[in-house]
Curated annotation (Swiss-Prot):
Keywords, ordered alphabetically: Disulfide bond, Ion channel impairing toxin, Knottin, Neurotoxin, Secreted, Toxin, Voltage-gated sodium channel impairing toxin
Name recorded for this polypeptide: Delta-ctenitoxin-Pr2d
Record's function text: Blocks voltage-gated sodium channels (Nav). Causes rapid general spastic paralysis and death when injected in mice at dose levels of less than 2 ug per mouse.
Disulphide connectivity of cysteines: 3-17, 10-23, 14-46, 16-31, 25-29
Pfam families, A to Z: D_CNTX
UniProt remark on domains: The presence of a 'disulfide through disulfide knot' structurally defines this protein as a knottin.
CC per GO annotation: extracellular region
Tissue: Expressed by the venom gland.
Secreted recorded as keyword: yes
MF-aspect GO terms: sodium channel regulator activity; toxin activity
Organism of provenance: Phoneutria reidyi
Domain of life: Eukaryota
Localization per record: Secreted
Family membership: Belongs to the neurotoxin 03 (Tx2) family. 06 subfamily.
Length: 47
């Protein structure tokens, strides 16, 4: 997806339970652990 008024998706790194994740368009942090995405409910438990 793209951000409103922008041509390209925006991503930035963020902290996910001590692991690197990505925030897309100032949305919630999206986390990776190995090859597996951490489910949103699991991420909530890390905060």
């Amino acid at each position: 997806g793209t951000c409103a008024g922008q041509d390209k998706p925006c991503k930035e790194t963020c902290d996910c339970c001590g692991e690197r994740g990505q925030c897309v368009c100032e949305g919630p942090c999206i986390c990776r652990q190995g090859y597996f995405w951490i489910a949103a409910y699991k991420l909530g438990n890390c905060k």
